[in-house]
Amino acid sequence: MRGETPTLQDYVLDLQPEATDLHCYEQLPDSSDEEDVIDSPAGQAEPDTSNYNIVTFCCQCKSTLRLCVQSTQVDIRILQELLMGSFGIVCPNCSTRL
């Protein structure tokens, strides 16, 4: 815009629409062998597991029980919630009397 007052010609643009190609020409490599490896259980990433020492009591005689388990952190928290609830572990002596 030049001048003190705007004119309509200052706002009207003389543009023509352009056609845009929206097709994707990307080609993926043929990896049918790799997909089989990834989809198989052996190809999946193993969750991080650790060894845990658990000390709890027999739900029958209240004797001390020591367990060593290998688990993920998420699963060990689930076990902790079970042990704090109604879930109980029985010692070998009490298991023969059941």
From Swiss-Prot:
Location within or outside the cell: Host cytoplasm; Host nucleus
Database matches in SUPFAM superfamilies: E7 C-terminal domain-like (SSF161234)
Residue span of motif LXCXE motif: 22-26
Gene Ontology molecular functions: DNA binding; DNA-binding transcription factor activity; protein domain specific binding; zinc ion binding
Outcome of substituting L67R: Complete loss of binding to HDAC1 and HDAC2. Complete loss of episomes. Impaired production of late transcripts
Keywords on record: Activator, DNA-binding, Early protein, G1/S host cell cycle checkpoint dysregulation by virus, Host cytoplasm, Host nucleus, Host-virus interaction, Inhibition of host innate immune response by virus, Inhibition of host interferon signaling pathway by virus, Interferon antiviral system evasion, Metal-binding, Modulation of host cell cycle by virus, Oncogene, Transcription, Transcription regulation, Viral immunoevasion, Zinc, Zinc-finger
UniProt record similarity statement: Belongs to the papillomaviridae E7 protein family.
Record remark on domains: The E7 terminal domain is an intrinsically disordered domain, whose flexibility and conformational transitions confer target adaptability to the oncoprotein. It allows adaptation to a variety of protein targets and exposes the PEST degradation sequence that regulates its turnover in the cell.
UniProt name for this protein: Protein E7
Organism: Human papillomavirus 31
Lineage: Viruses, Monodnaviria, Shotokuvirae, Cossaviricota, Papovaviricetes
